[in-house]
């Protein structure tokens, strides 16, 4: 979810969050080790390599044989074949993808990228300006909806799916269940969002099971806080809807009013009847038993009603076949809740995974250990450091990579989810980020190999989607809108009218997708990546602060990763191969895995490394 400044999470301040296809490979830029097991070496971008031990990474108690590779997509956007793209356009004008659009062919295309989890974003019924009152769904007020399609993170019914995504609205849940079944049939697992911190101001469940009580139905609205309330209130004051003073096509639907008296606290911890336009004004903060306005005093015994309601919601979707939950703004919910709820839900399915959207490195370990999360975002840290390198910013430095695994996530790097794109972040190919998707390839390699945790792609990333244009509420913000009905141009070329064969992609887009495919083929099953330790490699020659090398190794495999983020300088160096490495062989056969080129390195020599700017190699020997 898009972030704003000044948020606190569980009493701890969070950092704010703002919202040429040339790959030159040198056949000689290889570093060899001798082993009686298979070896894997990945070389990136002009780099010199000499292996010495450094900080060892903590091993898992359980050995894994496959890396989790997640593919995030919004069904509303993913299957939309309409190319009209009118800013603020209606669903009739701009169209919407459906659950049914995610066909067997689509899933096969996703699986080609060596994906094993699909994160379906925006599944749950959320506030929207499209009228489904004919189906018994109460219309939403335009004054508290962002965009015409609405934010997928302003949930209006936790027991329903978004009617936009159904061909037959009456059977929308059955269409979602069929998608889950199709996904599982392809040996893929299903992730959906769990948004625990807030709900839409219009929250009302039309489809809740019997005996389920809506949020706020039994609240005492005369008090600002009660441990038994679901919401926080501003007694005696009605809500004042914010405005930015700008006219849009949606202005005719807005009257500047929303009937909420007393006003409820806003989702980003704003305890005021007059939230600002930049606040999450369309949402209501849920009460987990923390009195934020009185020294954040906690009331967790007896169990707060919201805890019980949220447990039941998670179990409901687990019974639908969901295999895991990406938990929105996990740090804005008390650790005690996660410690309580995750084990309970895992009693229903022990193989469930919980991924926390997290931005405060100071509490990462706490949310993993006490909070029981399986994985956390590595946004503040690796993503931010890699983005600086990709953008060629003056303060970019590979020491940020070193800091991540040696300090920030030392001992739990395999619990960190690495990515370069998601719905909150700028598209790599956007003008504000890199301007060219290929410039991020060394960073993608580092993301996929630095730890054994999950790696994630955002749909369209693999074909260089630029997130360009004025979409509506999303604006021209270098992202693909999550608030509007929209077609995603580069992705639509791969979709090719539902054939999902990529025949409309140009050569550069096809090459980019193939690169992602080959890289993840190599890394997703690498024992060194999944279960190995990590060593930093000191280098010589002309290496600078835009070049980095490290080794991932296990008893079965060793992996050398060399990355050159420098846009201009070719890396040139000689690597001295120690005698003990090559003493059993007169030469070392190697295979460059991205091209399947087979090479031999003579024994007892220095190996010249020559790698062009922004290039990579994957070499097995």
Which residues does each PLM region occupy?
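Bacterial N-terminal signal peptides
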Residues: 42-51
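N-terminal structural segment of carbohydrate-active enzymes
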Residues: 57-189, 197-199, 204-207, 219-220, ...
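Alpha-amylase-like alpha-glycosidases and glucanotransferases acting on alpha-linked glucans and related
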Residues: 61-70, 154, 164-180, 205-324, ...
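Loop/helix patches that line or flank the sugar-binding groove of alpha-linked glycan CAZymes
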Residues: 65, 81, 128, 146, ...
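Short, solvent-exposed turn/loop segments enriched in Gly/Ser/Thr/Pro and often Arg
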Residues: 74-77, 119-130, 193-203, 328-334, ...
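Solvent-exposed beta-strand/loop surfaces of large extracellular or lumenal domains
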Residues: 588-604
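C-terminal beta-strand-rich structural cap/linker in extracellular carbohydrate-active enzymes
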Residues: 601-621
């Amino acid at each position: 979810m898009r972030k704003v400044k000044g948020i606190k999470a569980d009493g701890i301040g969070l950092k704010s969050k703002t919202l040429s296809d040339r790959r030159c490979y040198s056949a000689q830029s290889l570093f060899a080790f001798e082993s009686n097991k298979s070896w894997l070496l990945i070389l990136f971008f002009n780099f010199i390599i000499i292996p010495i031990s450094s900080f060892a990474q903590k091993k898992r108690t359980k050995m894994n044989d496959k890396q989790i590779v997640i593919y995030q997509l919004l069904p509303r956007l993913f299957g939309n074949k309409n190319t009209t793209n009118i800013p603020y356009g209606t669903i009739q004008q701009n169209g919407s993808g459906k659950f049914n659009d995610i066909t067997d062919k689509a899933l096969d295309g996703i699986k080609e990228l060596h994906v094993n989890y699909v994160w379906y974003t925006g599944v749950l019924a959320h506030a929207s300006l499209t009228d489904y009152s004919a189906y018994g769904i109460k219309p939403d007020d335009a004054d508290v909806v962002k965009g015409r399609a609405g934010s997928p993170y302003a949930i209006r019914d936790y027991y329903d799916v978004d009617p936009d995504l159904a061909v037959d609205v009456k059977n929308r849940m059955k269409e979602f269940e069929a998608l889950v079944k199709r996904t599982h049939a392809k040996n893929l697992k299903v992730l959906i969002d769990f948004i625990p911190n807030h709900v839409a101001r219009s929250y009302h469940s039309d489809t809740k099971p019997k005996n389920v009580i809506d949020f706020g139905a039994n609240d005492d609205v005369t008090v600002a806080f009660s441990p038994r309330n679901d919401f926080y209130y501003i007694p005696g004051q009605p809500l004042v809807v914010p405005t930015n003073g700008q006219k849009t096509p949606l202005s005719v639907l807005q009257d500047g009013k929303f009937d909420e008296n007393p006003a409820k606290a806003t989702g980003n911890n704003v305890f005021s009847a007059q939230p600002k336009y930049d606040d999450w004004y369309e949402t209501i903060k849920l009460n987990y038993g923390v009195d934020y306005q009185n020294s954040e005093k906690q009331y967790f015994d007896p169990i707060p009603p919201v805890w019980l309601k949220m447990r039941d919601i998670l179990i409901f979707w687990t019974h639908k076949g969901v295999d895991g939950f990406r938990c929105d703004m996990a740090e804005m919910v008390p650790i005690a809740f996660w410690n309580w709820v995750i084990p309970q839900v895992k009693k229903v399915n022990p193989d469930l995974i919980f991924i926390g959207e997290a931005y405060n490195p100071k509490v990462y370990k706490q949310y993993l250990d006490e909070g029981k999360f399986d994985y956390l975002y590595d946004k503040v840290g690796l993503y931010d450091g890699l983005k600086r390198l990709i953008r060629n910013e003056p303060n970019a430095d590979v020491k940020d990579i070193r800091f991540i695994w040696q300090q920030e996530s030392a001992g739990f790097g395999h619990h960190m989810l690495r990515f370069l794109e998601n719905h909150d972040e700028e598209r790599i190919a956007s003008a504000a980020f890199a301007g060219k998707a290929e410039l991020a390839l060394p960073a993608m390699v580092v993301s996929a190999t630095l730890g054994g945790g999950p790696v994630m792609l955002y749909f369209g990333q693999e074909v260089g989607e630029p997130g360009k244009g004025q979409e509506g509420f999303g604006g021209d913000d270098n992202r693909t809108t999550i608030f509007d009905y929209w077609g995603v141009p580069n992705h639509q070329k791969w979709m090719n009218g539902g054939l999902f064969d990529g025949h409309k992609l140009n050569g550069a887009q096809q090459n980019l997708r193939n690169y992602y495919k080959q890289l993840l083929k190599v890394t997703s099953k690498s024992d060194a990546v999944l279960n190995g330790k990590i060593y930093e490699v000191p280098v010589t020659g002309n290496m600078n602060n835009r070049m980095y090398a490290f080794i991932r190794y296990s008893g079965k495999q060793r992996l050398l990763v060399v990355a050159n983020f420098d846009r201009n300088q070719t890396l040139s160096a000689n690597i001295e191969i120690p005698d003990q490495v090559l003493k059993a062989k007169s030469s070392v056969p190697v295979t460059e895995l991205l091209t399947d080129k087979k090479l031999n390195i003579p024994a007892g020599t220095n190996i010249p490394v020559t790698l062009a700017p922004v290039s990579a190699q994957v070499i097995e020997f």
